[in-house]
Amino acid sequence: MEMGNQHPSISRLQEIQKEVKSIEQQVLGFSGLSDDKNYKKLERILTKQLFEIDSVDTEGKGDIQQARKRAAQETERLLKELEQNANHPHRLEIQNIFQEAQALVKEKVVPFYNGGNCVTDEFEEGIQDVILRLTHVKTGGKVSLRKARYHTLTKICAVQEIIENCMKKQPSLPLSEDAHPSVAKINSVMCEVNKTRGTLIALLMGVNNKETCRHLSCVLSGLMADLDALDVCGHTEIRNYRKEVVEDINQLLRYLDLEEEADTTHAFDLGQNHSILKIEKVLKRMREIKTELLQAQNPPELYLSAKTELQGLIGQLDEVSLEKNPCIREARRRAVIEVQTLITYIDLKEALEKRKLLACEEHPSHKAVWDVLGNLSEIQGEVLSFDGNRTDKNYIRLEELLTKQLLALDAVDPQGEEKCKAARKQAVKLAQNILSYLDLKSDEWEY
């Protein structure tokens, strides 16, 4: 049917579908909760479109009925997606962790800016724990979860940075007001900036409902204007003092932009991040080396060159910029473990090869430890090849094998032999490291 002769009901349905399509990306990328203003707005729009679709007269015609059904299904799909985004278990996990950070800020930081004692080590440890747990929240590559995790981390890391900067680099102590008429004003502005710092932290963490980003931005801009208006020509010390306070204000204004950037930035998509791409490049080469080693007819020929290249890969990972992003830091940490585990695997293989060449007598307990190390080497090869999750039968089997080796080591009696004690301790550590590596490989973490 040509457009000019199209039934009015079909045309109306197409208009509604176009309107629904126009907000699809907003729905798919929605990273908030069900009590957010934007959630209610999107829900209202979609519900209204459903009513509009329902009110289209089909006149009993099959083609119009089918078109109406398709339009309703598409709108219902987006409504369901919106609801799932807001109530996803991992989204709620992010919110619960954020609420812990809010409680920490309320208890430890806000009183500090209201004239209390200094920020405690307990707060710093608590925030570090929160950041670490957030980096471990699984997103499954889902845009809404990635955004939620990124925005939450960004705010908490900003608060951590504001406090660290404040503790590390206090501006010059207020100069004597006798030095110049402008000093009194700069001192006054500096006091206001310190108060505003506390307000900004409370605002970023959502523990101050009386303040808005816009108003705080106006306050800071006003303080900046006051400083700009001061005549400090020919007074280097006073000019430098003013410059420090101006830099502080600019830094706080940058933090204020975080909320606005949250909805426009694609920084949450770490798949395109330069540092992550470097890490991925290293991991790709590491996997190639691993495959060559595990499939080689004569692996010992490759040990030296493989170890040399792997150590070079560790060097490349050390050079990766973390960009103050805990997710990049975690990605690098895991990559280092991946490469280091392969180096350890080669080290053990080499040690076992050398032992074969030694035909000397040894203490029975020492031999028992070496037997376990031989078993661990075989199991480690399987763990390196493992590519599943914790529900896989193979995961459970490998975990049981490693536990058996730990029990075997526990049963070894060194009989006072110091060399045997040290060897057993080293073997236990290796078995535990392989277990930890198996856990790391199977925890389904992603950027």
Curated annotation (Swiss-Prot):
GO terms for biological process: Golgi organization; negative regulation of neuron projection development; negative regulation of oxidative stress-induced intrinsic apoptotic signaling pathway; negative regulation of proteasomal ubiquitin-dependent protein catabolic process; negative regulation of protein ubiquitination; protein stabilization; regulation of inclusion body assembly. GO terms for molecular function: adenyl-nucleotide exchange factor activity; protein kinase binding; protein-folding chaperone binding; ubiquitin protein ligase binding. One of its GO terms (cellular component) is junctional membrane complex. Pfam families: BAG. InterPro entries: BAG_chaperone_regulator, BAG_dom_sf, BAG_domain. The keyword Metal-binding does not apply. Disulfide bonds: none annotated. Residues 9-86, 95-167, 182-260, 275-350, 365-442 form the BAG domain. It comes from the Eukaryota. Keywords: Chaperone, Repeat. PANTHER family: BAG FAMILY MOLECULAR CHAPERONE REGULATOR 5, BCL2-ASSOCIATED ATHANOGENE. The fifth BAG domain is responsible for the interaction with HSP70 nucleotide-binding domain. Binds to the ATPase domain of HSP/HSP70 chaperones. Binds PRKN. Interacts complex with HSPA8 and JPH2. Co-chaperone for HSP/HSP70 proteins. It functions as a nucleotide-exchange factor promoting the release of ADP from HSP70, thereby activating Hsp70-mediated protein refolding. Has an essential role in maintaining proteostasis at junctional membrane complexes (JMC), where it may function as a scaffold between the HSPA8 chaperone and JMC proteins enabling correct, HSPA8-dependent JMC protein folding. Inhibits both auto-ubiquitination of PRKN and ubiquitination of target proteins by PRKN. This is BAG family molecular chaperone regulator 5. The lineage of its organism: Eukaryota, Metazoa, Chordata, Craniata, Vertebrata.
